[in-house]
């Protein structure tokens, strides 16, 4: 079955890439974003990376649900793929087992972090908007986004829901790289341009100031268009946001800084993501989103 999955995944990725490229899917948005931030994004390479990761999600996702729980078992090889944990990440992952806030982005194979973290014994909870029809949503929640019989997908919408998740000692996951178009969005900068920031992390830290904040991502070492998938090493990175940058009771009582200075997303997460994008802009899939629409809508009408 693993061999068949490899063949089907490779075939699907090629077909999906060809179809989307021919249709020019999101091409104008990608180019508008790239021009706005003066970033050398290769539309074809980005699309090839995106379809490859989508095919792995559809046909190879089960591999991540087989990964070992013990940190000492890494590096390991499962279903022909090699997995490892980055140097210095184990203590952070151990702390994540006690819960907190987990920030990540549409970067690389970001969906695969869900089952991997769950297999490591981390009580991950990720909020997703339910999809329709209901039977498809049930498949997503109970089959795809479930590990060892536990779904890590929840439909949390209110502040009370989010605080309850933290109170239960869960690790709350939030994709924090999208344009926030709600009235409470915070002003900030991203890739040198004005951009709205998701206010949720800062809201949670205001009410639970001792909550640790983590950032995780998967690095594919040896990844290149000519590198076989089986020869890549998938490395899990985990870092903790510096406590000095997180809202504390003392800081909350002091004169209020500007929104961009006080935002943990703007001051820490965006800087981390900018570094990842500089390393490889063709792995940040939010180039296909209108990330700067709230601040600069005109760039998407040219």
Annotate the PLM regions:
Residues 96-156, 182-184, 189, 227-228:
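Catalytic core of membrane glycerolipid acyltransferases/transacylases, capturing the structured
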Residues 36-37, 42-45, 94-95, 99, ...:
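Non-catalytic C-terminal accessory region of glycerolipid acyltransferases
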